[in-house]
């Protein structure tokens, strides 16, 4: 994934992680996972509920926070 693709993704996921916002993650096959984002990198998200699951980003369709989240995007980095 290009750096440009990370401009929205990283600040959004980081805000969810820092604020301990519960999320529902829908996979491309329709499965719904719920928990808190513990960590993430370019390829995976660690989702914590009763256990920690490693979810590959290419399998994720949608991330739905349980509440609104404020996050900043660095506009100067856009091309």
Curated annotation (Swiss-Prot):
Q: Name one GO cellular component term.
A: cytosol
Q: Which residues form the Sm domain?
A: 10-69
Answer whether the UniProt record assigns the keyword RNA-binding to this protein.
yes
Please list the GO biological process terms of this entry: regulation of DNA-templated transcription; regulation of RNA stability; regulation of translation, ncRNA-mediated
Q: What binding partners and quaternary form does the record give? A: Homohexamer.
Described by its record, this protein's role is as follows: RNA chaperone that binds small regulatory RNA (sRNAs) and mRNAs to facilitate mRNA translational regulation in response to envelope stress, environmental stress and changes in metabolite concentrations. Also binds with high specificity to tRNAs.
Under what name is this protein listed? RNA-binding protein Hfq
- Species whose genome carries this gene: Cupriavidus pinatubonensis (strain JMP 134 / LMG 1197) (Cupriavidus necator (strain JMP 134))
Chain's gene name:
hfq
């Amino acid at each position: 994934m290009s750096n440009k693709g990370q401009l929205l993704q990283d600040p959004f996921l980081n805000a969810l992680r820092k604020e301990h916002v519960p999320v529902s993650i829908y996979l491309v096959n329709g499965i719904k996972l719920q928990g808190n984002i513990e960590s993430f990198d370019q390829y995976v998200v660690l989702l914590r509920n009763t256990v920690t699951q490693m979810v590959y980003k290419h399998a994720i369709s949608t991330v739905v926070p349980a509440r609104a989240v404020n996050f900043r995007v660095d506009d100067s980095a856009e091309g």
